[in-house]
Amino acid sequence: MLIAIVGKPGVGKTSLLQYLKDNYHFSVFYADSFIHEQYQKNNPGYQLIMDHFGKEFVNQTEVDRKKLANYVFSDDKLIEKLSLVTKPLLIAWIKSLKTQFQKKLALIEIAVMLNYWNEYRSLFDYVIKLERDDQLVNLALQQRNSHKKVKDLIKEPNCKIDTIFNNDSIATAALKLIKLLETFLERNKCRCDCCHIQ
């Protein structure tokens, strides 16, 4: 069973999934990390960036992510282009995880899904959106020196999504998420041992 974890930058998606992995032994995956792996030389993402954006955005070993980010953040059309270029890689990866986790539970952080709902939604059994007060989001983005435009990259969904608010401790958010996952498993009447939450 694949569960998508979505939300705007700075809401704590990565921290929450890491906490669940460390403390509850969940299988967790990160779309951004997958794409970063694909940006290594001899991987498909490296060639795609070179083909679609030019040789100036790659070096001897990998895509120059900082240079690429500075370039694409200057224009919404370039952000869209980058997403379209990497989308086939992401979809193939998610499909392989779907096969691998047919009888297991896995959480995948994929913020960009909210911008391409129709392409990604059918790949997941459930979607959970993480939200946080704006003041906490701004603080989180400042602490990691994120580009100012990052906050607005992810669109608000135009449909109802199960939502968890991450305004307290990460442990509190984790317990909320686990409770929601338990309702999903009950809804699916999942009986396999590997899907039970410990």
From Swiss-Prot:
GO terms for cellular component: cytoplasm. Its main location: cytoplasm. GO terms for biological process: coenzyme A biosynthetic process. GO terms for molecular function: ATP binding; dephospho-CoA kinase activity. InterPro entries: Depp_CoAkinase, P-loop_NTPase. It holds the Pfam family CoaE. Pathway: Cofactor biosynthesis; coenzyme A biosynthesis; CoA from (R)-pantothenate: step 5/5. It is an enzyme of class 2 (transferase). It is found in: Cytoplasm. Its EC number is 2.7.1.24. PROSITE patterns: DPCK. Belongs to the CoaE family. Catalyzes the phosphorylation of the 3'-hydroxyl group of dephosphocoenzyme A to form coenzyme A. HAMAP family: Dephospho_CoA_kinase (MF_00376). This is Dephospho-CoA kinase. It comes from Mycoplasma genitalium (strain ATCC 33530 / DSM 19775 / NCTC 10195 / G37) (Mycoplasmoides genitalium).
